[in-house]
Structures are given as C-alpha cells and as structure tokens.
C-alpha cells in the first residue's frame, strides 16, 4: 500500500509551514537518477496547496528558497499550487451575494457575514492580506471554493495515476495547516 500526502497551507502561517515541509521533503530526496528531477520524484507521493491573500508573502517564500529549490529554475510555490484569495474583493462579493440570494453559496456568505460586519470591510482586493479579519478571507474563499475543489481533485487523481502503484492500494493522507489567530488561516 502506497501512502500519498497532500499538504494544504491556509493563510500566512499555514503557507509558511507547508513551504518548510515541502522544502524538507525535497531536501530528503537522495540519489535521484535518470532524467527525473527531485521534483518529479517528490510528485510521486506528495502534493502541496497554498491558500493565501498576501501575494507578498508568497513572493517572499519563493525568494527565500529560490537558490535551494531546483537551483532557481522553477518557483517553489507554483501558481498551480496556489489559491490566490488576494485577487478577491470581499466587499463586492458580499454586495453581489445580497443581490442574488437565491444562489446557495450566496446564502452561506450572507449567513456568515451580516450587514454590520460587511460595512467594516474595505472596498478593495485582499492582495495585502486579510488583516486578521476572518470574514474577509472566508468570503473570498467562498468565491474560489470551486477552484480549490478542482485543484484538490486533480491532486488526488494525479497521485493515483502513478503507474507503479494501483490506485486501489493508495492511501491519501491530508494535512491541513492553519493558524487560530490570523485572518486567512483561522
């Protein structure tokens, strides 16, 4: 039975922790030979996902590991692994949800965030973070939940496609790393 792993980092603290785990897994791979890179070998058993609002934090992590990860040829945190909540404007999302309350996800947004709370949201995208305001990132995540699900399903399918292991024999372990005090990760 093959054990496969999907690590999901939520918010700044979660993303930093999962990035460190990814680097440890990468560095632990020894004696990689043939035409496969360490990343190829790592991808046989591991997938990593990052959910964050602060693009600067993601850029800083890529810069921190730039010389250690594939000698800088590829970014350590790729766009395929990132759910970028920083592109979303929670204030606008809430207003659109109020205008179309018959849609299920909009009902959930309105249930989670009442008018009084929504009035305190800035009318801007979250590219500089959620500012420890949990409902900002949760509202943004609601809009990108389908994208998250698609990436998660693709990761599961890719891990089960590895030819030397039958999918029936794989056990996929999910590791979600987040914080309890911030905005996006809590």
What kind of region is each of these model predictions?
Residues 1-178, 186:
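Segments that form or flank anion-binding pockets
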């Amino acid at each position: 039975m093959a054990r496969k792993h999907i690590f999901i980092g939520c918010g700044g603290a979660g993303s930093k922790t999962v990035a460190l785990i990814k680097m440890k897994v990468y560095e632990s791979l020894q004696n990689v030979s043939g035409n496969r890179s360490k990343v190829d070998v790592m991808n046989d058993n591991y997938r990593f996902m990052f959910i964050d609002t602060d693009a600067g934090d993601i850029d800083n992590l890529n810069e921190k590991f730039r010389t250690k990860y594939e000698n800088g040829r590829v970014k350590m945190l790729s766009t395929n692994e990132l759910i970028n909540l920083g592109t979303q404007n929670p204030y606008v999302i809430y207003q659109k949800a109020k205008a179309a309350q018959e849609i299920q996800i909009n009902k959930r947004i309105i249930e989670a965030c009442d008018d009084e709370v929504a009035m305190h949201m800035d009318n801007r995208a979250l590219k500089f973070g959620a500012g420890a305001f949990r409902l900002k990132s949760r509202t943004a995540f609601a809009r990108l939940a389908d994208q998250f699900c698609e990436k998660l399903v693709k990761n599961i399918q890719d891990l089960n496609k590895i030819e030397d292991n039958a999918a029936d024999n794989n056990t996929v372990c999910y590791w979600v790393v987040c914080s309890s005090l911030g905005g996006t990760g809590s």
